[in-house]
C-alpha cells in the first residue's frame, strides 16, 4: 500500500529580514538629501510597521524606500496590509502597515475550494493557520503547487514539509 505524500501551505514572514530592511531604510532616510533632518521614523512593533513623516509626499517616499528594501530582502509585498494615512498636528503624516502572518479561515477556504475545483487528485484540509495538502502521487502535489502559484492570491504563500 502506497504511503500518502503531503505538503503544508503557510504564510509566514521572516521578522529578522523585516528588521534588516527597516534598518537599511532608516539608514537611507538619514542619508538622503530630501529626507535628511526631517525627523522621519520607521519602526516595527510586533507585526506592525509604523512610519512617521512630516508630510504625505515624504511618507510616500519612505514607503517606496521600505518596499524596495523589503523586496531586496526577499519579503513579498503581498504580506503587507497598508493602513490609512493619518494626519497629526503640525501637518505630520503617519501610516501603519500590518504584516500578515498565517492564513486566516476565509483565505484557507478559498485555497481548499480552488484545489478541489481543479479536479487534481489531492485532498486539502485546514489546520489552524496552515493548509495541508495530501495525495498519493507526487506529481499531483506538484500540480497543486503550480496551480496555487499561478492563481493570483492576495497573500504570500510558502510550501513547507514536502514529504
Swiss-Prot record:
A single GO molecular function term of this UniProt record: nucleotide binding
Keyword set, alphabetical order: Nucleotide-binding
CDD domains: YajQ_like (cd11740)
GO cellular component: cytosol
Role according to the record: Nucleotide-binding protein.
NCBIfam families: PRK05412.1
Family: Belongs to the YajQ family.
Protein name in the entry: Nucleotide-binding protein Clos_1967
Organism the protein comes from: Alkaliphilus oremlandii (strain OhILAs)
Amino acid at each position: 500500500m502506497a504511503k500518502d505524500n503531503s505538503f503544508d501551505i503557510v504564510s509566514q514572514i521572516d521578522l529578522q529580514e523585516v528588521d534588516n530592511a527597516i534598518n537599511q531604510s532608516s539608514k537611507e532616510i538619514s542619508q538622503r538629501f530630501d529626507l535628511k533632518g526631517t525627523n522621519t521614523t520607521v519602526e516595527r512593533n510586533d507585526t506592525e510597521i509604523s512610519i512617521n513623516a512630516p508630510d504625505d509626499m515624504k511618507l510616500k517616499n519612505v514607503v517606496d524606500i521600505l518596499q524596495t528594501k523589503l523586496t531586496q530582502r526577499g519579503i513579498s509585498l503581498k504580506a503587507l496590509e497598508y493602513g490609512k494615512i493619518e494626519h497629526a498636528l503640525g501637518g505630520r503624516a503617519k501610516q501603519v502597515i500590518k504584516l500578515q502572518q498565517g492564513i486566516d479561515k476565509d483565505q484557507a477556504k478559498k485555497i481548499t475550494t480552488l484545489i478541489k475545483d481543479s479536479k487534481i487528485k489531492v485532498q486539502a484540509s485546514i489546520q489552524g493557520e496552515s493548509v495541508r495538502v495530501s495525495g498519493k502521487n507526487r506529481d499531483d502535489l506538484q500540480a497543486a503547487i503550480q496551480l496555487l502559484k499561478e492563481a493570483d492570491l492576495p497573500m504570500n504563500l510558502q510550501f513547507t514539509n514536502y514529504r
